[in-house]
Amino acid sequence: IVGGDECNINEHRFLVALYDPDGFFC
């Protein structure tokens, strides 16, 4: 999950960073 409206959600960004640091590009 990279880019798009999803990156505008802080909680989502945080969860993505924890789940897949290598895929955290927001």
Swiss-Prot record:
Keyword flag Protease: yes
Lineage: Eukaryota, Metazoa, Chordata, Craniata, Vertebrata
Documented EC number(s): 3.4.21.-
Tissue spec. comment: Expressed by the venom gland.
Full protein name: Thrombin-like enzyme LmrSP-3
Main location: secreted
Gene Ontology biological-process entries: proteolysis
Subcellular location: Secreted
Keywords: Blood coagulation cascade activating toxin, Fibrinogenolytic toxin, Hemostasis impairing toxin, Hydrolase, Protease, Secreted, Serine protease, Toxin
GO cellular component, one term: extracellular region
Family: Belongs to the peptidase S1 family. Snake venom subfamily.
Single Gene Ontology MF annotation: toxin activity
